[in-house]
């Protein structure tokens, strides 16, 4: 269920989803979102909540939408938000969605911020161009058997490799396809950051990330940056 509160808020969120726990592996989603936030990735407030909908009591998962409030909660200033544009997936019926899942471009999701003024327009358009270029490069590289990781920042920036690593460790392959990705552009650091959403995380099952993809995903000298957090 997509919910919008016309008055008041829940933990500052006015737009959020109520999800059936089994569609997000229940507490796996709650724990995964918390782990990512503790590692300073942008991650939505997610928790179990008792609800009464049309007279039916049920346990649901609360998850806030990717909006201004999500950025503020994660100590980021409001800026351009993007996601994979899934329209291509539904345009070619003879192809299965999984075939085109990494052959998409991005789209802006917070158009209200874009319309605030000339500065926000310029920042959004410039970052949009950079992200589109990264999506195209990622699609070409992946088709040639290279890394599947989309890298819209400088090559020395490891944030997207780190995100791919921790998502893979939590069996979140679903959230790594380009069609399911969300991004925030930080104008102060002039760089993109990944936003966690819909990873289909599961800490108990066997890895669902293709071994060949893992083998080609990282640079040879890659090391996960955040191991000290859990030492």
Language-model-derived ranges and their functions:
Residues 36-41, 165-171:
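Sec-exported extracytoplasmic/periplasmic mature domains
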Residues 10-58, 126-159:
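A conserved hydrophobic secondary-structure block that centers on an alpha-helix together
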Residues 1-13:
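Compositionally biased P/S/T/G-rich terminal and signal peptide-adjacent segments
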Residues 44-50, 177-184:
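A short glycine-rich, hydrophobically flanked beta-strand micro-motif that places a catalytic Asp/Glu
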Residues 117-125, 129-150, 158, 171-172, ...:
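C-terminal catalytic region of ATP-dependent kinase domains
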Residues 8-10, 23-25, 56-58, 67-69, ...:
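Solvent-exposed loop/turn segments at secondary-structure junctions
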Residues 67-169:
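ATP-dependent phospho-/nucleotidyl transfer catalytic cores
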